[in-house]
């Protein structure tokens, strides 16, 4: 049935041709997107569907809270460790555990490492090919590519011979007739605007980033034992420090600390001289995308804040990445966020495949219920082979979180906007410099292109914080402060009979919160509200659409059968790239299939 209504400044109209892109994600989770387009190929309705049930909240009930981090860490292998961090924060908050300064520092090093790694992988491996036309790189002149690269930075891998070798590798790859992971790209699509030389440079850096990302995560291996899924502990960090090598075998020693320093230096070098120039190059040739994909970013954004500089202090003055919320586009009034307040964060399920006693009322995570109820309602196809969702009913395995009743965007763009408008000096300088270099107004950052630029900015910011926290750690060690964990309240006998806590941080993709309740030494309730829950949110009882859905509205598609515009905007949020993408007509007939191998 055709419907039309107004919400959040958009006119939702599900008449017209229906396209289905399914799935959109790679690695963690699965996502489906459906849009309606009018006769001018403009998106008039967008529907975001999470197609996988997680259920870890149910698995955790009755378990030892000290083990929760090891379970929830498996929510995601890409932003590895961040769920464990939120979990230990929550359990420590519940029990009243204070961690040593070194533990806080190392946790921040782990998080900053993740930000650098995740943003690099997203920029090149997950979203890069939405902007870089791989096959067009074959037309490039390696000498002109070298001139371009050397004009942008002092990165040593920029000689004509280097780019000739990269181009020759690509040429042999193409001539072999098996493009592998590049086989099903929309190469030649009219939205690809980079010249051949910039495409060759971008492709070369894609390969370099693929290799270098393996180096960054060695920091996790030093302090957490491995990557992905490094080790953590309630009360601190599990890594002993043995500077003079007189203590525990396998503890962190000077050799490993020197390795960490060398990786930090090389990470900052790569981000400053490769990623930042590449992001600006993409921006320079794609300025119209500074007006596409705005979505909720000019209305409602949210950040919890992260990187406490003072151990056990999560107040505004301690958090190096500021937190706050903006609603109704009032960026002059950044509101404080209280994750314990039952009126602030609430989750709704009236359009999700869950049920509450009253589906029209949202529930705070401390009162959360995870009761799966797969009931797709009146859909085209069948319950097990849905050809077209019915967004007027239930249509996603993702709940709809709201902050004071508002759908919110979270992630690098939201964080950058909040930090900028709270006057964070480093953010203001970085953003102004990038937008000035592109000759774009500040409002241009509230866009699909802006999300790409904000990730580059954050990677650079995080690299600086890596060095900052490592220097703090080394100062402590030189002063004889080696403690990395507190075991004072390790035993359940020291805990209250009943207690509850909240742990929050900022994952690369956005605001992350874990809420835990403990009774008689066991987990009685556990709820996670993750970044993708916010951004991929379905509708709520008011009909408000989520961040993904809003960002797609009013986007004009050049070739609907090649939905590059949809992928660019969705990938700008970093929901992970598609393993396979199918575009379907409104009768379920397949128009085009893209399989990324």
UniProtKB/Swiss-Prot annotation:
<dbReference type="InterPro" id="IPR001501">
    <property type="entry name" value="Ni-dep_hyd_lsu"/>
</dbReference>
<dbReference type="GO" id="GO:0006113">
    <property type="term" value="P:fermentation"/>
</dbReference>
<dbReference type="GO" id="GO:0009061">
    <property type="term" value="P:anaerobic respiration"/>
</dbReference>
<dbReference type="GO" id="GO:0098567">
    <property type="term" value="C:periplasmic side of plasma membrane"/>
</dbReference>
<dbReference type="Pfam" id="PF00374">
    <property type="entry name" value="NiFeSe_Hases"/>
</dbReference>
<dbReference type="GO" id="GO:0033748">
    <property type="term" value="F:hydrogenase (acceptor) activity"/>
</dbReference>
<dbReference type="GO" id="GO:0019645">
    <property type="term" value="P:anaerobic electron transport chain"/>
</dbReference>
<dbReference type="GO" id="GO:0009267">
    <property type="term" value="P:cellular response to starvation"/>
</dbReference>
<dbReference type="GO" id="GO:0016020">
    <property type="term" value="C:membrane"/>
</dbReference>
<feature type="binding site">
    <location>
        <position position="576"/>
    </location>
    <ligand>
        <name>Ni(2+)</name>
    </ligand>
</feature>
<dbReference type="InterPro" id="IPR029014">
    <property type="entry name" value="NiFe-Hase_large"/>
</dbReference>
<comment type="subunit">
    <text>Heterodimer of a large and a small subunit.</text>
</comment>
<dbReference type="GO" id="GO:0016151">
    <property type="term" value="F:nickel cation binding"/>
</dbReference>
<feature type="binding site">
    <location>
        <position position="79"/>
    </location>
    <ligand>
        <name>Ni(2+)</name>
    </ligand>
</feature>
<dbReference type="GO" id="GO:0044569">
    <property type="term" value="C:[Ni-Fe] hydrogenase complex"/>
</dbReference>
<dbReference type="InterPro" id="IPR018194">
    <property type="entry name" value="Ni-dep_hyd_lsu_Ni_BS"/>
</dbReference>
<keyword id="KW-0533">Nickel</keyword>
<dbReference type="GO" id="GO:1902421">
    <property type="term" value="P:hydrogen metabolic process"/>
</dbReference>
<keyword id="KW-0560">Oxidoreductase</keyword>
<dbReference type="GO" id="GO:0030288">
    <property type="term" value="C:outer membrane-bounded periplasmic space"/>
</dbReference>
<feature type="binding site">
    <location>
        <position position="76"/>
    </location>
    <ligand>
        <name>Ni(2+)</name>
    </ligand>
</feature>
<dbReference type="InterPro" id="IPR050867">
    <property type="entry name" value="NiFe/NiFeSe_hydrgnase_LSU"/>
</dbReference>
<feature type="binding site">
    <location>
        <position position="579"/>
    </location>
    <ligand>
        <name>Ni(2+)</name>
    </ligand>
</feature>
<protein>
    <recommendedName>
        <fullName>Hydrogenase-1 large chain</fullName>
        <ecNumber>1.12.99.6</ecNumber>
    </recommendedName>
</protein>
<keyword id="KW-0479">Metal-binding</keyword>
<keyword id="KW-1003">Cell membrane</keyword>
<comment type="similarity">
    <text>Belongs to the [NiFe]/[NiFeSe] hydrogenase large subunit family.</text>
</comment>
<dbReference type="GO" id="GO:0008901">
    <property type="term" value="F:ferredoxin hydrogenase activity"/>
</dbReference>
<dbReference type="GO" id="GO:0009055">
    <property type="term" value="F:electron transfer activity"/>
</dbReference>
<keyword id="KW-0472">Membrane</keyword>
<comment type="function">
    <text>This is one of three E.coli hydrogenases synthesized in response to different physiological conditions. HYD1 is believed to have a role in hydrogen cycling during fermentative growth.</text>
</comment>
């Amino acid at each position: 049935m055709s419907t039309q209504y107004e919400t959040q400044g958009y006119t939702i109209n599900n008449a017209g041709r229906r396209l289905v892109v399914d799935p959109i994600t790679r690695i963690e989770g699965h996502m489906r997107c459906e849009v309606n387009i009018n006769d001018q190929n403009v998106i008039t309705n967008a529907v975001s569907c999470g197609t996988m049930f997680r259920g870890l909240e149910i698995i955790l009930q009755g378990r030892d809270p000290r083990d929760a981090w090891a379970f929830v860490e498996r929510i995601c292998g890409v932003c590895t460790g961040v769920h464990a961090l939120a979990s230990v924060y929550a359990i420590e908050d519940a029990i009243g555990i204070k961690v040593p300064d070194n533990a806080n520092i190392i946790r921040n090093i782990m998080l900053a490492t993740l930000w650098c790694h995740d943003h690099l992988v997203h920029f090149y491996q997950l979203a890069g090919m939405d902007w870089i036309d791989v096959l067009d790189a074959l037309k490039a002149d390696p000498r002109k590519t070298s001139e371009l690269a050397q004009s942008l930075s002092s990165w040593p891998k920029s000689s004509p011979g280097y780019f000739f070798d990269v181009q020759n590798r690509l040429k042999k790859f193409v001539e072999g007739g098996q493009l592998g992971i590049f086989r099903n790209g929309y190469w030649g699509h009219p939205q690809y605007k980079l010249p051949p030389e910039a495409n060759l440079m971008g492709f070369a850096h894609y390969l370099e980033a693929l290799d270098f990302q393996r180096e960054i995560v060695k920091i996790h291996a030093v302090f957490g034992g491995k990557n992905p899924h490094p080790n953590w502990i309630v009360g601190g960090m599990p890594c002993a420090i043995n500077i003079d090598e007189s203590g525990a075998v396998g503890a962190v020693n000077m050799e490993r600390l020197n390795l960490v320093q060398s990786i930090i230096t090389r990470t900052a070098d790569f981000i400053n001289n490769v990623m930042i120039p590449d992001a600006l190059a993409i921006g320079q040739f794609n300025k119209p995308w500074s007006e596409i994909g705005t979505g909720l970013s000019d209305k409602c954004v949210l950040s919890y804040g992260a990187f406490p500089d003072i151990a056990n202090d999560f107040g505004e003055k301690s958090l190096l990445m500021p937190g706050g919320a903006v609603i109704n586009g009032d960026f002059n009034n950044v509101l404080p966020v209280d994750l314990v307040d039952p009126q602030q964060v609430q989750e709704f399920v009236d359009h999700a495949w869950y049920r509450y006693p009253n589906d029209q009322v949202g529930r705070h995570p401390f009162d959360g219920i995870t009761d799966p109820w797969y009931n797709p309602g009146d859909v085209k196809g069948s319950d097990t082979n849905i050809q077209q969702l019915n967004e007027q009913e239930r249509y996603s395995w993702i709940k709809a979180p709201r902050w004071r009743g508002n759908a919110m965007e979270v992630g690098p763009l939201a964080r950058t906007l909040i930090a900028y408008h709270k006057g964070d000096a480093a953010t203001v300088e970085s953003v102004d410099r990038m937008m000035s270099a592109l000759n774009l107004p500040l409002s241009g950052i509230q866009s699909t292109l802006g999300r790409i630029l904000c990730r580059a900015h954050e990677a650079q910011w995080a690299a600086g914080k890596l060095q900052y926290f490592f220097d703090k750690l080394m100062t402590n060690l030189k002063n004889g402060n080696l403690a990395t964990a507190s075991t004072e309240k390790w035993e359940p006998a020291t805990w209250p009979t009943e207690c509850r806590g909240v742990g929050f941080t900022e994952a690369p993709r956005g605001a992350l919160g874990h809420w835990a309740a403990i009774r008689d030494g066991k987990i009685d309730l556990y709820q996670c509200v993750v970044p993708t829950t916010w951004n991929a949110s379905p509708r709520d009882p008011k009909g408000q659409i989520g961040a993904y859905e809003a960002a797609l509205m009013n986007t004009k598609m050049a070739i609907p059968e090649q939905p590059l515009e949809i992928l660019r905007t969705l990938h700008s949020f970093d929901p992970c790239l598609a393993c396979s993408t199918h575009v379907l007509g409104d009768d379920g007939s397949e128009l085009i299939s893209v399989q990324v191998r």
